[in-house]
């Protein structure tokens, strides 16, 4: 049976929680801090038997922390909370990690793991606060999603400071609200967003969650967090499905000029939600090998 415990922190009056999956022996004394993609809860990292990143990595000796983004899932904010940006959310998350470290509740070093929009949040945390010694970015890059932008929005590509000034207005104009309600999840008609089987696609639907509009807007805008990407100076591990979204994987490392090394893995017969495919085994083995290099 998988052993897990709940972690709690109060950050500037905001209660935040996470789930910690305890490492099996022999322990590596390394923590993986994991953030899900937009529209998914932390349950994405514990999707189903044999399709659980948390279970696989804890069996390999890592402590694994999974956490919902501030404002969604178990970490909903008060209805009257002011509009907040992904950079502010990255600050909340980094403060929570510091709190748990000071309380002796987590092992260091910590490796940041992010899927899709969660990868952007991990990059913001590292670029602004540097809590991690390595980053694992799954289906995530700094290249944005140009196809998700209107012509008017595209005018802000590679203009991070101008975009930051307009982020609130653009997010509310595009999505109509600060928090996007949970959707129904993937239809299963496409490998890109579905799972390998109808059952795994259903598990993705069950893991659906709210999404922060500003986070969605920022993750789609190429160059929106270029200063943070430029500042990342730790080794990077990228994983993409061969039916993933975003810019070509070969172009992704170019946005991280300060990273001392990068490794890219392409998962065959895999969509954007990697853990819903049997290639999760290849992904976990490759990641573990990279950490041990």
Where are these regions (language model features)?
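Conserved loop-alpha-helix segment in the C-terminal half of the alpha/beta-hydrolase fold
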Residues: 240-270
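N-terminal cap/lid segment of alpha/beta-hydrolase-fold proteins
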Residues: 1-24
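Short, surface-exposed "cap/lid" segments of acyl-processing enzymes
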Residues: 26-59
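Glycine-rich "HGGG/HGxG" loop immediately N-terminal to the catalytic nucleophile
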Residues: 68-84, 272-273
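Alpha/beta-hydrolase active-site loop
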Residues: 83-103
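Conserved alpha/beta-hydrolase
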Residues: 49-76
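Alpha/beta-hydrolase
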Residues: 153-243
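Catalytic histidine-centered segment of alpha/beta-hydrolase-like enzymes
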Residues: 270-281
């Amino acid at each position: 049976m998988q052993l897990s415990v709940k972690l709690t922190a109060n950050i500037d009056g905001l209660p935040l929680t996470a789930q910690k999956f305890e490492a099996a022996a022999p322990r590596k004394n390394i923590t993986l801090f994991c953030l899900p993609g937009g529209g998914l809860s932390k349950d994405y990292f514990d999707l189903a038997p044999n399709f659980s990143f948390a279970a696989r990595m804890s069996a390999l000796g890592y402590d694994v922390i999974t956490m919902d983004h501030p404002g969604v899932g178990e970490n909903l904010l008060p209805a009257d909370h002011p509009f907040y940006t992904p950079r502010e959310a990255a600050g909340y998350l980094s403060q929570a990690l510091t709190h748990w470290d000071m309380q002796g509740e987590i092992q260091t070093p910590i490796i940041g793991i992010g899927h899709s929009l969660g990868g952007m949040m991990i990059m913001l945390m590292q670029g602004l606060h540097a809590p991690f010694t390595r980053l694992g970015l799954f289906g995530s890059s700094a290249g944005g999603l140009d196809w998700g932008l209107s012509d008017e929005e595209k005018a802000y590509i590679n203009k991070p400071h101008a975009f930051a000034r307009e982020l609130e207005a653009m997010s509310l104009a595009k999505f109509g609200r600060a928090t996007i309600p949970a959707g129904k999840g993937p239809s299963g008609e496409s490998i890109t967003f579905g799972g390998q089987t109808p059952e795994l696609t259903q598990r993705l639907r069950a893991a659906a969650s709210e999404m922060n509009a500003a986070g969605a807007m920022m993750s789609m805008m190429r160059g929106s967090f270029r200063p943070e990407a430029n500042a990342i100076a730790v080794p990077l591990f990228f994983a993409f499905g061969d039916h993933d979204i975003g810019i070509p994987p070969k172009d992704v490392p170019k946005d991280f000029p300060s990273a001392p090394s990068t490794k890219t893995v392409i998962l065959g017969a895999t969509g954007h939600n990697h853990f819903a495919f049997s290639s999760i085994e290849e992904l976990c083995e490759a990641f573990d090998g990279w950490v041990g290099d």
